[in-house]
Each structure stands twice: as structure tokens, then as C-alpha cells.
Amino acid sequence: PTPIPGLYEMVFGARVAYVSADGQYMLMGELIDLDSRRNLTTMRRAGLILKSIDALGEANMIVLGPAKPKRTLTVFTDVDCPYCARLHQEVPKLTQAGVKVRYLLYPRAGNDTETYRRSVAVWCAKDRVKAIGVAKSGGKVEMKTCANPVDEHVRLGHEVGVEGTPTIVMDDGRVLPGYAPAAELLAALGLQDGKKIEPAR
């Protein structure tokens, strides 16, 4: 149920829609409480996104940063994306400030591509953190295959609504599409004063 009599919520992964009680009408859009000025759809989606990410588990991510972080960012990244490489250069500033960065491999061009194969190779490397740094700097990664979660990362990206890389998910479920420098990310996380970026959804 929703706060509107006769309107019910439907959930598809991390996506939210609304349907009339008789099942005749479906509404795709934002449900906003004008009294409190809260976007109820965004709040619900944030919880669903976090649930989906938690279900994947950190064992299926490439994790950088402190074991006991102040805040956490989950980043859908493409190993051949220039803006992802720029963000990766900012990661040391984030981790030094107590932010854990968790990478999910999201080859935008699809699964029958060199980028996909490089993503798998990064995952299969003995040192994944080192390998992703090499890949993002344009270096050669030893091409290996092994059991890997890359397809699951892509599926989760579709569920979250990733349209490009990098896509950053904050630990409150807000989604930030595109590159942002460390200072803006730290401000958005409440760890530093400065210009705050507004999440898209």
C-alpha cells in the first residue's frame, strides 16, 4: 500500500511502480509528499538498491580502503572508461578520509567485447586492486578467465538503472551518475565542507 487510498506499490528489483487497486492502471513516476516535501519513491528505491547491493556481498566486489570505514561508496566502473580512470585517481583521497570504495565491473559495450574480457581478467588476477589500477591506466592485464561475478555486476547495474559509468551509489542508497572529484564526494558524504553534488535519484 501507499499513502494514497487505492494505489499500491509494485517492486521490480530496485525499481518502483504504482498500480490501481483493480489492476487496470499502472503509474511509473515519482510519488512526492507535498507536506513533508519528501520524495517517497526515491526513498523507497534507495532502500531497495542497498538491499540488492548487500545481497551481492563484498566478497563479489573489488574493495579499496579501510576495514572500518566512516562511509562507503559502491561504484559501477568500466575498465576502459576515461572518467572512471579519473575517478580512480581520486580514490586515494577518499580512502585517506576514511571512505571505503567498492568497485563493480560494468563493461558498457556488452559481454562479447575486449572490455568485458579485460574486466574478467581484472577479477581473475591474483591482486585485483593492483590489476584494476593497471587496467584503468591503460596498462596490460594478463588475460585470464575464471569463475567471476561480472555478469552479476552488470545485472545489478541494470536493476539500479545505470546508464553510464562511473555510477556511484552512496551508502544511503542515493545514486550519483558520472564523475565527481573527491572533494565533492566527501562533501556529499558529510566528511568535508565544500560544494555538494545533488544525487540524480
What are these regions (language model features)?
Residues 95:
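Anion (oxyanion) recognition and catalysis
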Residues 88-89:
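Histidine-anchored nucleotide/phosphate-binding helix
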Residues 1-63, 70:
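Extracytoplasmic c-type cytochrome modules immediately beyond a signal peptide or single-pass transmembrane anchor
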Residues 50, 185-188:
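Extracytoplasmic and endomembrane cell-envelope/extracellular-matrix remodeling and assembly machinery
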